[in-house]
Regions:
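Hydrophobic alpha/beta core scaffold segments
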Residues: 559-563
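Cofactor-pocket helix-loop regions in the catalytic cores of large enzyme subunits
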Residues: 539
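Active-site glycine- and acidic-residue-rich loops that bind
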Residues: 544
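N-terminal localization/anchoring segments of enzymes in phospholipid and broader phosphate metabolism
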Residues: 1-534, 552-556, 568-588
Length: 588
């Protein structure tokens, strides 16, 4: 049915669907009912999301266009080249929307005494201050370069701001480059005035003429390149005894820094001549160069800008602070570990705190009857109490096994570092499978009791990340069910033995049983016809079999509702939806 389903409009391209998701993030920044500082943060999130999209998805399609030009996407029938063309066309207006939203937010912040200022707006004393600041704090850490036969074009690190300057000397043109050091703060406030600030790259632009004082400066712009980050692991066998996956990942991260450029962003319009010069140097096409006319190319400072306001004003311009509550099923001060031995506990993040789970691991680390703790880890906070408690458990003589997924996108280095810390403490570290990422969120505590052992199992939908548990909606079940515990024990044994085809009584485990069982449950609702009901909540929906089954259910009269955060390859229907399409809701 795959060909027919896209020809009939029942599926859509995943990349274009992702851009629609990010457009919804941008819409939050455009919404005047959203507090001003939150709007600015949404602009920064939109920008960061788009960076990762180009690094991974556009990077992957660029490779595919070169290696498999005739291969067509199963959900839209488009080749990689056709997908890239549509992506570039869809992204261009998003830049314009971001610029407009930034101009509005920036103007409103100025009214709240947070004013982004240009060099042209400074008086003479302020100019003198910025010149001293440049000479003492910025110039000493700069590494400018003029590209010529003796100074070849350097490697440009991705997502790092640079200044490009078109220079002239004795009728010969040269390209000058100034990397913006990461050690410099993104913004600088004027002296005795915590209301007006300049962007560091704007200061560098202003002093580019003095940096290249031997040349005439013809044009200049801030730019940033985005590199393909979709790097496959090398050809060494994944399970080779001679090769530690951690070492392979470290090599992959080094390789990622030198991959092809897939996007160039400019901060101001440049002449066609200068643009052509950049084309040749970066080896990109015209449609891969994007212009940000108003918004800074990097906006991470949005998350700390409010710190310069008074407490009262910052509160007025921000969402009310969200504080997760004590779980309703667990009275304050009560041990989750001991409670779970008596009854199941369901935690709902972020509405309820993750702290009881963390304290359960801490308690297990110091509980004499606890024999072992086993857990899967995909993403962790940069400062993780969970790691501290797992290390304590190992140091206290518990058998601690951690299955840590080193290939969690853009968390690779973080996970490498944590795996080393856990291993040093005596934890047994395993990495998973060659062709699959381990995305399960499961923890098993084994406890010796009179007459045998008891299991306490936690199964959840969200990462063991103390930061994102305050932001993302997830559920976490903690149970002492013997059958679930036995399944969990078998799961960890299978992971340690690289056995994907384990058999389980209660747990549904991808890729062998999760999808088939969900499709079977949906068949049961299809058999009920108009009395059937299906409610699904996803991060993303891209699976063709699932989309076809949802289409089948809708055609059978089943009421189908979906709540989807990100990509949805089943296109939106009108509301109420026609009989052959499920109803979907998108959340940000």
């Amino acid at each position: 049915m795959t060909d027919a389903i896209w020809n009939q409009g029942y599926t859509q391209n995943r990349e274009l669907s992702w851009l629609e998701f990010n457009a919804r993030v941008l819409a939050e920044a455009e919404d005047e009912t959203v507090p001003l500082l939150e709007r600015f943060k949404f602009l920064a999130i939109f920008t960061s999301n788009l960076d990762e999209f180009f690094m991974i998805r556009v990077g992957s399609l660029t490779d595919m266009a070169a290696l498999e030009p005739n291969r067509r996407d199963t959900k839209s029938g488009l080749t990689a080249e056709e997908q890239l063309s549509r992506i570039y066309a869809a992204v261009e207006p998003l830049y314009a929307r971001r610029d407009a939203a930034f101009r509005d937010v920036d103007a409103r912040l100025a009214q709240e005494d947070l004013c982004r200022t240009s060099m042209d707006e400074l008086d003479s004393s302020e100019r003198k201050y910025i010149k001293r600041y440049f000479n003492t704090m910025i110039a000493p850490v700069l590494s400018p370069q003029v590209v010529d036969s003796h100074h070849p074009f350097p490697h440009l690190e991705g997502k790092v701001l640079h200044i490009a300057v078109l220079l002239s000397h004795k009728k010969n043109e040269r390209l000058g480059l100034i990397p913006v050091p990461a050690s410099l703060p993104p913004i600088t406030f004027l002296p005795n005035d915590k209301r007006r600030y300049l962007m560091t790259e704007d200061i560098l632009l202003a002093f580019a003429d003095s940096i290249f004082e031997m040349y005439d400066v013809l044009e200049k712009t801030v730019f940033c390149v985005t590199r393909n980050a979709d790097v496959p692991l090398d050809d060494e066998p994944f399970g080779s005894e001679q090769v530690d996956l951690r070492k392979k990942m470290e090599r992959m991260l080094r390789q990622r820094r030198r991959m092809a450029i897939v996007r160039v962003e400019l901060s101001r319009p440049v002449s066609s001549h200068f643009k052509e010069c950049l084309h040749k140097r970066f080896e990109v096409t015209d449609e891969q160069i994007f212009l940000s006319r108003s918004a800074p190319l990097r906006m991470s400072y949005a998350f700390s800008l409010g710190d310069y306001l008074s407490d009262g004003r910052r509160s007025r311009l921000s969402d009310p602070p969200f504080i997760p509550q004590q779980p309703a099923m667990l009275p304050a001060g009560q041990s989750l570990l001991k409670t779970a031995l008596q009854r199941d506990v369901l935690l709902s993040y972020p509405y309820e705190s993750m702290e009881p789970f963390l304290q359960m691991i801490r308690e297990a680390a110091n509980d004499p009857p606890v024999l072992s703790v086993r857990i899967t880890i995909y993403r962790l906070a940069s400062k993780a109490k969970l790691v501290e408690y797992l290390c304590a458990a190992a140091e206290n003589g518990k058998d601690v096994t951690v299955l840590i997924e080193l290939r969690a996108r853009f968390d690779e280095q973080n996970n490498i570092d944590w795996s080393e810390r856990l291993e040093e403490a005596g934890c047994k570290i395993i990495y998973g499978f060659e062709d699959y990422k381990v995305h399960s969120k499961i923890c098993l505590i084994t406890r010796r009791e009179r007459g045998g052992v008891r299991y306490i199992t936690q199964v959840g939908t969200g990462n063991y990340n103390e930061k994102t548990a305050r932001q993302y909606t997830d559920v976490s079940l903690v149970t002492s069910s013997e059958s679930i515990g036995m399944d969990a024990a078998q799961f960890f044994n299978n992971m340690a033995m690289s056995n994907l085809n384990g058999r389980y009584n209660r747990l549904l485990v991808a890729p062998t049983s999760l999808k088939n069982n969900i499709l079977s449950l949906m068949d049961g609702e299809i058999a009920k016809g108009s009395d059937g009901y299906i409610l699904l909540k996803f991060n993303s929906l891209t699976d063709i079999d699932m989309i076809e089954k949802l289409h089948e259910a809708s055609c059978a009269g089943v009421t189908v509702e979906m709540i989807i955060r990100g990509i949805c390859c089943a296109p939106p229907a009108s509301h109420p939806p026609p009989a052959d399409r499920p109803d979907r809701k998108s959340v940000v």
